[in-house]
């Protein structure tokens, strides 16, 4: 019985769980890169406080309220939506972190079939 317990502890301790130090990524200035349909690299920079995110893309500014529902998950709502689709809230969940970046998934709230993933690099605090 004692041997089984030791083996169980060894098995559990050898599992490699992804690092999730989400609190350090709730605020700061970040950079998000994506690829357009034409193959161009698109760069979005954004600054996030505990309750507001301001993004800069193609010389346009976009603002969202941020509500953290856990250390690693938040809900975004556009400050001044101009269309029905912009009124939809977006759910974002940090999946893993490392020293200065994180991997995340996002979708409209309640839309579990259309989740997408991304990678963000933290530029400054």
Regions found by a protein language model. Name each.
Residues 1-8:
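Sec-dependent signal peptide recognition
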Residues 11-14:
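C-terminal motif of bacterial Sec signal peptides marking the signal peptidase cleavage site
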Residues 16-18:
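Bacterial signal peptide processing site
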Residues 22-38:
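Tryptophan-anchored aromatic micro-motifs
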Residues 40-69:
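N-terminal glycine/threonine-rich, aromatic-flanked beta-hairpin/loop signature
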Residues 55, 103-117:
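Short, exposed beta-strand-loop hairpins at the edges of beta-sheets
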Residues 65-73, 94-101, 122-125:
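A short, structured loop/turn motif at beta-sheet edges
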Residues 75-99:
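An anionic, turn-rich surface loop/hairpin at beta-sheet edges
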């Amino acid at each position: 019985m004692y041997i089984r317990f030791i083996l169980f502890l060894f098995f559990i301790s050898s599992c490699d769980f992804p690092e999730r130090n989400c609190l350090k990524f709730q605020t700061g200035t970040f950079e998000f890169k994506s690829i357009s349909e034409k193959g161009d690299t698109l760069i979005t920079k954004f600054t996030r406080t505990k309750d507001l995110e301001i993004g800069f893309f193609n010389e346009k500014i976009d603002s969202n309220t941020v509500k953290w529902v856990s250390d690693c998950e938040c809900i975004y709502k556009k400050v001044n939506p101009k269309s029905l689709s912009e009124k939809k809230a977006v759910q974002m969940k940090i999946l893993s972190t490392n020293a200065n970046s994180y991997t995340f998934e996002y979708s409209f709230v309640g839309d579990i079939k259309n989740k997408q993933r991304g990678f963000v690099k933290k530029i400054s605090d």
